[in-house]
From Swiss-Prot:
Organism: Pseudomonas paraeruginosa (strain DSM 24068 / PA7)
Gene Ontology BP term (one): translation
Taxon lineage: Bacteria, Pseudomonadati, Pseudomonadota, Gammaproteobacteria, Pseudomonadales
Name recorded for this polypeptide: Large ribosomal subunit protein uL5
UniProt superkingdom: Bacteria
One of the record's GO molecular function terms: rRNA binding
Keyword line: Ribonucleoprotein, Ribosomal protein, RNA-binding, rRNA-binding, tRNA-binding
Family membership noted in the UniProt record: Belongs to the universal ribosomal protein uL5 family.
Complex and partners: Part of the 50S ribosomal subunit; part of the 5S rRNA/L5/L18/L25 subcomplex. Contacts the 5S rRNA and the P site tRNA. Forms a bridge to the 30S subunit in the 70S ribosome.
Amino acid sequence: MARLKEIYRKEIAPKLKEELQLANVMEVPRVTKITLNMGLGEAVGDKKIIENAVADLEKITGQKPIVTYARKSIAGFKIREGWPIGVKVTLRSDRMYEFLDRLLSISLPRVRDFRGLNAKSFDGRGNYSMGVKEQIIFPEIDYDKIDALRGLDITLTTTARTDDEGRALLRAFKFPFRN
């Protein structure tokens, strides 16, 4: 079992149940999935960019990402319907907890000029989104073998009903929020 999953079950869930004054342990908010998305607008003319992004995301997550395609043609962005424009991967269960553990303990401390995560990046339903400017903060990526610095979006989907419940859950996981 993943280290963070065990910590959640033994320490975080009972503490949150008391803190949020919930009647049942099944009401306690939990992280259900983590979605990593890499938007590749520059990949319009080059298939190699997509292949490199897939390889990077696969190294980071240990899971094969899927390529996302444009749903509509947009002349302003010079894209056609059906062209590949990004890659994404959804992590659940043990892989999700292992990724979260690596993100919090290894990757975020490696971010240059890191002052903490924005505590206001919740969506109103307890889900949290954050962006990473460069993929080299992950130790799985070899700096010498990357072709370009690419950012990615990380979305944590939780069962929390409100932002405050979601914030309490992520604080219990020791998320480094700014304020």
